[in-house]
UniProtKB/Swiss-Prot annotation:
Lineage summary: Bacteria, Pseudomonadati, Thermodesulfobacteriota, Desulfuromonadia, Geobacterales
UniProt family annotation: Belongs to the CobT family.
Organism: Geobacter sp. (strain M21)
Family matches, as PANTHER family: NICOTINATE-NUCLEOTIDE--DIMETHYLBENZIMIDAZOLE PHOSPHORIBOSYLTRANSFERASE
Pathway assignment: Nucleoside biosynthesis; alpha-ribazole biosynthesis; alpha-ribazole from 5,6-dimethylbenzimidazole: step 1/2
The protein's Enzyme Commission number: 2.4.2.21
Protein's recorded name: Nicotinate-nucleotide--dimethylbenzimidazole phosphoribosyltransferase
CDD domains: DMB-PRT_CobT
Encoding gene, per UniProt annotation: cobT
SUPFAM superfamilies attached to this UniProt entry: Nicotinate mononucleotide:5,6-dimethylbenzimidazole phosphoribosyltransferase (CobT) (SSF52733)
Stated role: Catalyzes the synthesis of alpha-ribazole-5'-phosphate from nicotinate mononucleotide (NAMN) and 5,6-dimethylbenzimidazole (DMB).
Active-site annotation: 318 (proton acceptor)
Keyword Transferase: yes
């Protein structure tokens, strides 16, 4: 709990004066004011977050957190939980979607085992920080203890602290965990007080009958556990996931260290939502990578006040959207740093 409390105490609002100064710098580039649209918003936010009007773009890292879910035993997913460790091994071999798109963006992928029901051999690119071998079935009991939830959050915070020490310029979130759309739907339903049906979709591609079953299972879990929306740790522990907790910690740690954090899709945003509920200033450090096909994602984004960069009908997770968005954010920073001013170009303003 000490690491979590320390991170929360360090999070400050982004400096409004820096945002204005970055915009003034952009307005002096050889273009009509505002003509690069959302690229300008990304550039000024990146500069203000880092506290540097000429931010250097060094290493970019996508942290893909992996964990299993007890709720899978209720038949809420198209795939068995054995796919979680199989996909982790695919990440480590460089063969997954996130690997391909991260390579394209010039980003590194680091896989974090925070709760997979499998014992991995130590491998390059794998960070083993296992809190438990998956969550428990939240349709029957609490997914985690409060202590487990905090421990998983602190895994993410520690990784953000290490990223700062390494000089990493931007971090992205990703995840792998069969069944993890169910806790994500439960989390937003708990905070928003909405019906489970409003925020639950097909995940990996389940049919109509399976979707109805999934909705009933999630509702049963919420009815049983009664998570307190005024207590984010209670929501996380009762109906969340270990990888979701790890993502929440990475987002909190990024905000505490003034590192821009690119949040992927539905499950990653569930983690970001926990972080924002723990500290309202966290949202100022988040770049929402994309608008997911999962219907609960829009409600999450509205709640944290985030505007998605991309809308490509993505629903894979892993950090794929984050990797893609990183390239656009980097492009926006290059505009801020490399585009000529009117004076430099000899152009009349």
């Amino acid at each position: 709990m000490e690491l979590l409390e320390s991170a929360l105490a360090k999070i400050q609002p982004v400096d409004e004066a820096l945002l204005a100064q970055a915009q003034a710098k952009l307005d002096n580039k050889t273009k009509p004011p505002g003509s690069l649209g959302l690229l300008e918003e990304m550039a000024r936010r990146f500069a203000a977050i880092t506290g540097d009007l000429s931010p250097k773009m060094g290493k970019k890292v996508v942290f893909t957190f992996a964990g299993d879910h007890g709720i899978v035993e209720e038949g809420v997913s198209l795939y068995p939980k054995e796919v979680t460790p199989q996909m982790v091994l695919n990440f480590l071999r460089g063969g997954a979607g996130v690997n391909v798109l991260a390579r394209h963006a010039g980003a590194e992928v680091r896989v974090v085992d925070v709760g997979v029901d499998y014992d991995f051999e130590p491998t390059e690119g794998l960070i083993i920080r296992k809190i438990a071998k998956g969550t428990r079935n939240f349709a029957k009991e609490s997914a985690m203890t409060r202590e487990e939830a905090v421990a998983a959050i602190e895994v993410g915070i520690a990784l953000a602290d290490r990223a700062k020490a390494e000089g990493i310029s931007m971090v992205g979130t990703g995840e792998m965990g069969i069944g993890n759309t169910s806790p994500s739907s439960a989390i937003i339903a708990a905070f928003a007080g909405c019906s489970v049906r409003e925020v639950t979709h097909r995940g990996t591609g389940i049919g109509d009958q399976a979707l109805e079953h999934k909705i009933k299972v999630i509702q049963a879990g919420l009815d049983l556990n009664r998570p307190n929306p005024e207590d984010p740790l209670d929501v996380l522990a009762k109906v969340g996931g270990l990888e979701i907790a790890g993502i929440a910690g990475l987002v909190l740690g990024a905000a505490a260290n003034r590192i821009p954090v690119v949040v992927d899709g539905f499950i990653s945003t569930a983690g970001a939502l926990i972080a924002c509920e723990l500290h309202p200033n966290v949202r100022e450090y988040i770049f929402a990578a994309h608008n997911s096909v999962e219907i609960g994602h829009q409600m999450m984004l509205q709640r944290i006040g985030a505007k998605p960069i991309l809308d490509l009908q993505l629903r894979l997770g892993e950090g794929t959207g984050a990797a893609l968005a990183m390239g656009l954010i980097e492009a926006s920073v290059k505009v801020l740093n490399e585009m000529a001013t009117f004076e430099e170009a000899g152009v009349t303003s």
